[in-house]
């Protein structure tokens, strides 16, 4: 994502946007390419021919990647906190995973943590549903991924809100002998949706367990 455009602070940057929809491709004054992403990238590669970025630019990218990895390792490393953060939980699983393990996530704050901390070491080992915060896709999607990759471990990161929405597919995975590793993190309910609700001027409406109208 753009980080509310904080990722593009250089006033001289140029944006090339590939999209099947002309309206979306032209947003933010981008140089538009209307077409399928894979086909468009292949044609762009052919058009570029032997062109390469400068060695100075390659060095900068390597240095920035090294700095980023060091930062992520530090922030997601072992902790003495009474309760580990999302970053600590994802980091612990990542460090103990195999390169072929597949990570799945979809909704809430876990998406942001997983895409930063889970740095794939093999192709097709990271599935994240960004688009519309598809709560509970983490479970049904993980089941489908396991069915397609029976010889790999599938690890899905789930908040308690998504878990309550669609835990029945965990049962489906068990009875069909499709093993899943489900990491359920306590978020007190749908905390991210609650935050969005409040930031837009609304009031809490049964998003958090503590503010829901439940009997004792």
Regions found by a protein language model. Name each.
Residues 1-61, 197, 212-215:
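Glycine-rich, acidic loop regions that bind phosphate or pyrophosphate groups
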Residues 65-146, 151:
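Active-site diphosphate/adenylate-binding microenvironment
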Residues 11, 19, 36-40, 44, ...:
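General structural feature for long, well-ordered alpha-helical segments within catalytic domains
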Residues 54-79, 145, 181, 187-199:
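Charged, low-complexity, helix-prone segments enriched in Lys/Glu/Asp/Gln
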């Amino acid at each position: 994502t753009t980080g509310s455009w904080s990722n593009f602070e250089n006033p001289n940057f140029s944006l090339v946007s590939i999209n099947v929809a002309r309206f979306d491709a032209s947003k933010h004054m981008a140089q538009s390419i209307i077409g399928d992403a894979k086909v468009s990238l292949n044609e762009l590669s052919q058009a570029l021919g032997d062109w390469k970025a400068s060695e100075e630019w390659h060095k900068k990218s390597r240095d920035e990647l090294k700095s980023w990895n060091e930062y992520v390792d530090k922030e997601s490393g072992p902790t003495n906190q009474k309760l580990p953060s999302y970053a600590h939980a994802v980091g612990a699983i990542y460090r103990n995973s195999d390169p072929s393990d597949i990570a799945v996530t979809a909704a809430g704050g876990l998406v942001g943590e997983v895409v930063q901390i889970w740095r794939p070491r093999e192709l097709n080992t990271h599935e994240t549903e960004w688009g519309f915060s598809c709560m509970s896709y983490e479970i049904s999607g993980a089941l489908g991924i396991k069915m397609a990759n029976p010889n790999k471990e599938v690890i899905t990161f789930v908040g308690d809100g998504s878990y309550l929405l669609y835990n029945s597919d965990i049962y489906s995975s068990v009875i069909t002998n499709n093993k899943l590793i489900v990491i359920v993190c306590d978020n007190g309910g749908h905390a991210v949706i609650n935050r969005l609700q409040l930031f837009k001027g609304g009031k809490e409406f049964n998003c958090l367990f503590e503010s829901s109208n439940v009997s004792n």
